[in-house]
Amino acid sequence: MEDESYQLFKTDICGFCARVQQFMTLRSINIELRDIVNDELARQELLKGGGKAVVPCLRIKNGDSVDWLYESMDIIRYLDERFSTSRA
């Protein structure tokens, strides 16, 4: 997991984004947040990389590869699996 880095693309008015952020807070998971409403560069990056400007979206960079994970519950499951092993 050392080579992985994460960014959560979100908006302040998105309930599904809030769900992911609440989970991150409860688990003390610190990931860079990118607001696609207030940051046009973030919106463009999400659109170019992920193929759609839909939030929430977790950008997962692992070495040279980048994956884009949409859907709040999928993001929560992924974070739960990734960070529960490192917290054991």
Residue locations for each model-derived region?
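Residue-level detector of conserved, well-ordered beta-strand and adjacent loop positions
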Residues: F9, R59, Y70
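Amphipathic alpha-helical interface surfaces
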Residues: F16, V20, A42, V54, ...
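Thiol-based oxidoreductase modules, predominantly thioredoxin-like and allied folds used
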Residues: I29-A42
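Short, charge-rich, low-complexity interaction segments located
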Residues: R43-K48
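Structural micro-motif
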Residues: G49-R59
